[in-house]
């Protein structure tokens, strides 16, 4: 089974415009994310962007990048365009890795890839325990709510995504912003 990692990235983010090109230790955030994805060694990695500046930066740092339309409403739309332009027929899963996750643990990417392939699920995602009570009320942190504690045995269950949490008795996790989906499911999601 083959996996493709696509990292959507654009300069016009609402909270912090230009974020992908901000430097950490002399390297742009988007190039850090690309390197982490490549280091996971689970498949080819591409950045999908509408911005020439991001394309230039990623290429300068040895990354693969596809220029996409600037008309997309979501990163998923951008990812699907990239996938179509690549015209790869043997991809079983596409991992959507957000372009602002330079601290992503490559073992988490490997684990997600292994789980979706083992269980042959249509969609998988990553969530982490919320260790700080103040993060529960932070609307900028996307939450995952489940009816039971997430463990390795039930990781593949469906979850609801919420930004505003009112009932703190639920099992609430921080959504990491990484998805894995079968290409045909991604196509349905963007339709």
Spans of features found by a protein language model:
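Residue-level signal for inorganic ion chemistry
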Residues: 30, 100, 182
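Residue-level signal for alpha-helix termini/capping positions
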Residues: 38, 84-88, 117
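Short, high-confidence coil segments that cap the C-terminus of an alpha-helix
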Residues: 42, 88-91, 119-122
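Short phosphate-binding loop-to-helix
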Residues: 46, 52-111
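Conserved core of the sugar-phosphate nucleotidyltransferase
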Residues: 104-191
């Amino acid at each position: 089974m083959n996996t493709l990692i696509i990292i959507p990235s654009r300069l016009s983010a609402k909270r912090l415009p230009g974020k992908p090109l901000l430097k950490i230790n002399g390297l742009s955030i988007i190039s850090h994310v690309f390197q982490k994805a490549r280091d996971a060694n689970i498949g080819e990695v591409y950045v999908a962007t509408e911005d020439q500046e991001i394309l230039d930066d990623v290429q300068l740092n040895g990354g693969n990048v596809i220029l996409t339309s600037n008309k997309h409403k979501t990163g998923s739309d951008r990812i699907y365009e990239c996938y179509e332009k690549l015209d790869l027929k043997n991809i079983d899963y596409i991992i959507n890795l957000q372009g602002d996750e330079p601290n992503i643990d490559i073992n988490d990417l490997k684990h997600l890839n292994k789980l979706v392939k083992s269980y042959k699920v249509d969609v998988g995602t990553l969530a982490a325990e919320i260790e700080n009570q103040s993060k529960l009320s932070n609307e900028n942190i996307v939450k995952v709510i489940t009816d039971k504690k997430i463990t390795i045995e039930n990781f593949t269950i469906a979850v609801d995504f919420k930004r505003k949490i009112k009932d703190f008795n639920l099992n609430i996790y921080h959504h990491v912003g990484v998805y894995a989906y079968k290409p045909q499911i991604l196509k349905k999601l963007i339709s």
